[in-house]
Design a protein with these regions (language model features):
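Short glycine/proline- and aromatic-enriched beta-strand/turn motifs that initiate or cap beta-hairpins
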Residues: 35-89, 249
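Transmembrane beta-strands of outer-membrane beta-barrel pores
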Residues: 61-67, 104-112, 153-155, 170-178, ...
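Extracellular/periplasm-exposed beta-strand and loop segments of Gram-negative cell-envelope proteins
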Residues: 70-77, 111-121, 126-142, 175-185, ...
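Predominantly the C-terminal beta-signal and adjacent terminal strand-loop region
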Residues: 193-249
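Bacterial Sec-dependent N-terminal signal peptides
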Residues: 1-41, 246-249
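Residues that define the transmembrane beta-barrel architecture of outer-membrane proteins
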Residues: 53-55, 76-82, 141-147, 198-202, ...
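Residues on the lipid-exposed face of transmembrane beta-strands in outer-membrane beta-barrel proteins
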Residues: 84-90, 104-106, 145-153, 168-172, ...
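Short loop/turn motifs that connect adjacent beta-strands in outer-membrane beta-barrel proteins
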Residues: 43-54, 91-98, 156-164
Length: 249
């Protein structure tokens, strides 16, 4: 009788141990799955809540042409420009694919042409260089502070920096330095701080492209010159600049 009772107690003890280990194993497995689910949920939340911005720094290169030119004026050499600046990106929709942006930048524009600029009695004078006249260089250049404001559409996502974009806007530019130079075999004539240049320029622009490569075009809405005349006629030339632009960060 005693042996039967001891055997029964031992069997109950073994069953209790098995039950304890089974419960412990189930709790451990549940805890692991719970931690993985929480990690995935947190990762998902980070991506959804990320308030990213795009294309806040830019630099570009342009080929500069002149429109509304006086009769006889031509551009015979390559005229180039360079610009760089900062734009604050401000998304206006939930997916952050539509935005407005505004900022500040600098540009340098160079125009090679055959409009000679001289100074006579401290006042600038202008003339079209005769085609038979030999000269080495004739150009004017400008350095401007730019204030662009633009509307932006793009296919960007938080995960990728490769996307299509179309940006268009309006730009104010303030002239801070100008220089005209005529050079021939006899020497150079240099004119700076020409009061006939328009100090405040404005125009529209557009840029479009994918990832790194974007085409850019700017059209000036007012004349480069404010009060310059040639043979009694106002010089009302405007700028048309076409090139490429790069956006980063």
């Amino acid at each position: 009788m005693y042996l039967r009772l001891a055997s029964k107690q031992s069997l109950n003890k073994n069953n209790n141990m098995r039950l304890f280990f089974s419960c412990f194993l189930l709790l451990s497995i549940f805890n692991v799955f719970s931690q993985e689910t929480t990690t995935l949920e947190n990762t998902s939340k980070v991506k959804i809540d990320s308030l990213y911005r795009e294309d806040q720094f830019y630099f570009g290169f342009t080929y500069n042409t002149l429109t509304n030119k006086p009769e006889g004026l031509s551009q015979s050499k390559l005229s180039t420009g360079f610009s760089l600046g900062f734009l604050r990106d401000m998304p206006i929709n939930k997916n952050r694919t539509v935005a407005i942006a505004s900022g500040i930048g600098f540009s340098y524009n160079n125009y090679n042409q055959n409009l000679a600029i001289y100074k006579s009695d401290q006042a600038p004078t202008y003339s079209i260089i005769d085609p038979e006249t030999s000269f080495n260089k004739n150009k004017f250049s400008q350095v401007l502070v730019e204030v662009p404001i633009e509307f932006r559409w793009r296919t960007s996502t938080y995960e990728s920096h490769k996307f299509w974009r179309i940006y268009g806007g309006f730009k104010l530019s303030y002239l801070i330095h100008d220089r005209s130079i005529f050079e021939d075999a006899q020497g150079k004539i240099i004119v700076t701080s020409n009061k006939d240049f328009n100090k405040l320029l404005y125009g529209t622009y557009i840029s479009a492209g994918y990832n790194t490569i974007n085409v850019y075009a700017y059209y000036g809405l007012n004349s480069l010159f404010k009060s310059a005349k040639i043979e009694g006629e106002p010089i009302a030339m405007k700028s048309l600049n076409i090139g490429i632009i790069f956006y980063i960060l």
